[in-house]
Amino acid sequence: MKRIVLVLLACAALLPAQTRKPTSSKLISIKVTGSTRYTPAQIIAATGLQLGQTVNDEDFKGVSQHLGETGAFSDVAYSFEFNAEGIKLALQVKDANPFVPVRFENFVWLSDQELADKIRTREPLFQGQLPVGGNLADQLSETLQAIAIEHNLHGRVDYLRAGPQDGPVEAFEYSISGAPITIRKVSFTGAGAAELPLLTAVARRISGQDYSRSRLTLDADKNFLPIFLQHGYLKASVGPPQPKVVEETADETQVDIAFDITPGLQYKLSSIQLSGNTNIFPPEKLRELIHLQPGEPANAVQADQDVEELKKLYGTRGYMGVQIQPTPETHDTDSTVTYVFKFQEGSIYKMGDLEVRGLDSKATERMIAAWRLLPGQTYDSGYSKVFLDSIAGQFPPDLWKIAVRETPEDQDKIVDVSLRFDAKR
């Protein structure tokens, strides 16, 4: 709950009429305390007060209310005192929490720095984050709309509170609607000769799409960065998309996108180590499923794929919650890396309930009878494939689609299985 408190240090009502202080006077100083997020200068700028202007208690009440309504502060108190020169104002604030990041989805006409600078001249409390409560998010939307009008942009600025459904707000996402913003081409700086053709090939599908910073950032993480991780550049990074307007009409804005690549060192694999409890399976069995090759560039994407195969292996013994962490220990002096695979097998899961869907009652009964993994037995994640192979004669794959869904229940340490049969048309 936000609190706004006032303290009047000059009790004018107690003074004789001939010595009573004026209700309005010149503002000669402002002192701000209590915030670790903002500087006094930023908070003073947010008040809108100017030294030398004539002020009174009503002005200070308005300032306190304004600061409180932004959501940036959980408490706002003020006091003031008179002297022969004018009024001294003291503001005591307490920072509110939480704050979350702000994302600008498609403001392609200004760089991030230019946009931030323009915002800060109008919204001194903006620092790249906003409080989840209060009206500062609305104020920022109005500021962005004003900036858009200054640049003769006729779209409407809106924002979304991003986050999981029924979960906390994780970010504010601002965008401008109107004429489409289309990607013409994508380029990369900093990429090596071996990686550049691969990047260019992946980027071709982006050309012609609407510009979306969040989608491009996802592309960078999911499609561009793995190209470097596959080739041993374990510390590579892909910078944010940098749009440049190349053509603009009333109906469309076209942009070129540049990504700045920082590959870093290329690491070659020196050795593989297994740690944790590796007694469930012989070490040589585990190593058979790890395809990294000593002396070759360390393929981090392959390491993640190998982990999935190792998890499947552990699942055949009921370890459905096994944790396997591949950790690269890099050595920059000789550009080598030791990959350490740490195993935490967790608990053994048992077979739970079996559900069969999509068949008539008799066929359902036959499938339940044919399923040999009984409730309470140690679960085998490989059994479903064995089962599907055993019924392939009754349900040929070219005529039937059979989906297997495994649902581990962590509390009871069981796995419920659902088999869905759909006839292909």
Regions found by a protein language model. Give the residues of each.
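Hydrophobic h-region of N-terminal signal peptides that target proteins for export
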Residues: 8-17
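Interaction-mediating elements
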Residues: 19-425
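Positively charged n-region of N-terminal signal peptides that target proteins for export
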Residues: 1-4, 155
